[in-house]
Amino acid sequence: MDSPTILEREFTTFRPPSGEIESVKIFQREDGKWFLRLAVSWKGGIACDVCLYDKPKLKLYSSIVSAVRHVCSTYEYAGRIILFPNRGRPIK
């Protein structure tokens, strides 16, 4: 992981009162799994890879549908989501 990381609890349970998710990018890895990279207002808009709720391990999704659903329902994000599929991998 080249990007800084952020624990999921930092923008769900412990999100600052005026904190906002500024952008969402979803990347596909070589193994076909998907992960999130979010930019949040309280970290100066720096894009961070999302880790598990309480562990610094990358949170992975088996399908793009589950990743998008999680962003929209759990994080209450209603903006643009940019997808970065891995060339040569099927999108599922």
Give the residues covered by each predicted segment.
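Short, compact, well-ordered microdomains
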Residues: 60-92
